[in-house]
């Protein structure tokens, strides 16, 4: 092979190898955008609520003119901007029964009329911690003279909610080991 032919062949092979490794030139391009989305739902969660144990009620001396107070707490955690409304069930209501309180605990024999009246109050109402109003707001489901409670939700941090109760003084009730009532707390949001 002549020397010029070798040079020409070498240059041709080199050119082919050089352009073979080069990216192909695009004839055009296309783009497409997309959105990343998510929805934040209103969610509220309550912790377990401990029993509201008033303790011993003495209608003869200690509680003859002063009610027996008690409270229990729970935490409420909601997404920011949720609008929770807390209500308490009204299982054993005392309305129209000429009793001292709005609610009633029984001693296991409700048919005999053995009830111990008590009240539960909306936080910050008369009788409750941090009271700011002139009349009590009885905590219930918004019916029968009761109110619900709508706490504000400034952020996702848990809030402690206090359920404050009073057993009114001087009730004429029979001796019993325990009086009780079952109350259900509900949060709607």
Question: Model-found features: residue ranges?
Answer:
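Extracellular beta-sheet repeat scaffolds used for adhesion and glycan interaction
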Residues: 126-156
